[in-house]
């Protein structure tokens, strides 16, 4: 297995959000909230805000609203 693979995959995330632009906006805004002190909504092994945000999207905890 290639250790550089992103998990969850971009393809999986796009099925939840719709397009790459919305995915970037959603995850970056959520990561910024975490950086500014918001508590993560899921428990993950990573302390990186963007990784946490991506996993929250993958678990359908954070959703994109138009």
From Swiss-Prot:
Alphabetical list of Pfam families matching this protein: RNA_pol_Rpb6 (PF01192)
Keyword Hydrolase attributed: no
Keyword field: DNA-directed RNA polymerase, Nucleotidyltransferase, Transcription, Transferase
EC number: 2.7.7.6
The reaction(s) this protein catalyses: RNA(n) + a ribonucleoside 5'-triphosphate = RNA(n+1) + diphosphate
GO BP term (any one): DNA-templated transcription
Cellular component aspect of the GO annotation: DNA-directed RNA polymerase complex
UniProt GO MF annotations: DNA binding; DNA-directed RNA polymerase activity
Homology family: Belongs to the RNA polymerase subunit omega family.
Function: Promotes RNA polymerase assembly. Latches the N- and C-terminal regions of the beta' subunit thereby facilitating its interaction with the beta and alpha subunits.
NCBIfam families per the UniProt record, alphabetical: rpoZ
Subunit note: The RNAP catalytic core consists of 2 alpha, 1 beta, 1 beta' and 1 omega subunit. When a sigma factor is associated with the core the holoenzyme is formed, which can initiate transcription.
Name listed for the protein in its UniProt record: DNA-directed RNA polymerase subunit omega
Source species of the chain: Clostridium botulinum (strain Alaska E43 / Type E3)
């Amino acid at each position: 297995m290639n250790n550089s693979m992103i998990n969850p995959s971009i393809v999986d995330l796009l099925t939840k959000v719709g397009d790459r632009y919305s995915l970037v906006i959603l995850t970056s805004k959520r990561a910024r909230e975490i950086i500014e002190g918001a508590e993560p909504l899921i428990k993950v092994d990573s302390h990186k805000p963007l990784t946490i945000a991506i996993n929250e999207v993958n678990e359908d905890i954070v959703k994109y609203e138009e």
